[in-house]
């Protein structure tokens, strides 16, 4: 998982989740696209 200051969708399969005020990007097709803001 990458930790970044700004997260964005890297492909059309990525989707954004907000959990406990932490924004995450999850991708079922390419797990390499997982990101967390922080």
Swiss-Prot record:
Q: Name one GO molecular function term.
A: structural constituent of ribosome
Identify the domain of life.
Bacteria
Annotated GO biological processes are:
translation
Q: Name one GO cellular component term.
A: ribosome
Q: Which Pfam families match?
A: Ribosomal_L36
Could you list this entry's UniProt keywords, alphabetically sorted.
Ribonucleoprotein, Ribosomal protein
Record-linked PROSITE patterns: RIBOSOMAL_L36 (PS00828)
Give the record's family classification: Belongs to the bacterial ribosomal protein bL36 family.
Q: What is this protein called?
A: Large ribosomal subunit protein bL36
Q: Which gene encodes it?
A: rpmJ
